[in-house]
């Protein structure tokens, strides 16, 4: 098989993973999502956002203390040319600004950077952010293993720990 045209990836143990690569290929066929990246003040979160930009899947709006962000980028060799940067005083401020941008519809998605989850969740759930609905907040993530042929989409492993039946109904509605 020609590796340059394959959508498969070999893992260290020789297994093949395909699901996430197929998902990424599908997403690349769509218009990029305008995504606020909240406080990407470490090389990992900033690099992930820039990788997604290079893949053509997002248009990042970086919200962080600008001086700190530029220092992280310089240290990691990351080029911020063409990125929209919104200066924020600190991580809490970045979360509040990002939530307001999402609430106003100026971005389509949020990506957590190097701030604590509770900081971001507090800003998202603040009444003035405009993001609350009548249903519970839920989340999901994609996980792939070598021993199963498709990726798993796992919801509420951390936010709704022991949901009631009514809360489970909201989780399912949100997932659909």
Where are these regions (language model features)?
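Anion-binding alpha/beta catalytic cores of soluble intermediary-metabolism enzymes, centered on
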Residues: 2-61, 65-176
């Amino acid at each position: 098989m020609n590796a340059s045209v394959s959508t498969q990836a070999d893992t260290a143990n020789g297994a093949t993973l395909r699901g996430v690569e197929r998902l990424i290929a599908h997403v690349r066929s769509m218009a990029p999502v305008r995504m606020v990246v909240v406080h990407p003040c470490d090389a990992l979160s900033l690099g992930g956002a820039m990788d997604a930009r290079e893949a053509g899947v997002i248009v990042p709006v970086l919200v962080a203390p600008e001086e700190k962000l530029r220092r992280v980028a310089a240290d990691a060799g990351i080029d911020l040319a063409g990125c929209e940067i919104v200066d924020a005083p600190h991580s809490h401020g970045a979360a509040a600004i990002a939530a307001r941008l999402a609430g106003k519809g100026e971005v389509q998605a949020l990506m957590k950077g190097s701030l604590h989850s509770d900081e971001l969740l507090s800003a998202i759930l603040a009444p003035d952010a405009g993001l609350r609905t009548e249903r519970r907040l839920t989340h999901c993530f994609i996980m792939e293993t070598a021993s199963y042929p498709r990726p798993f989409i796992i919801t509420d492993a951390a936010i709704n720990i022991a949901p009631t039946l009514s809360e489970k109904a909201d989780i399912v509605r949100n997932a659909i």
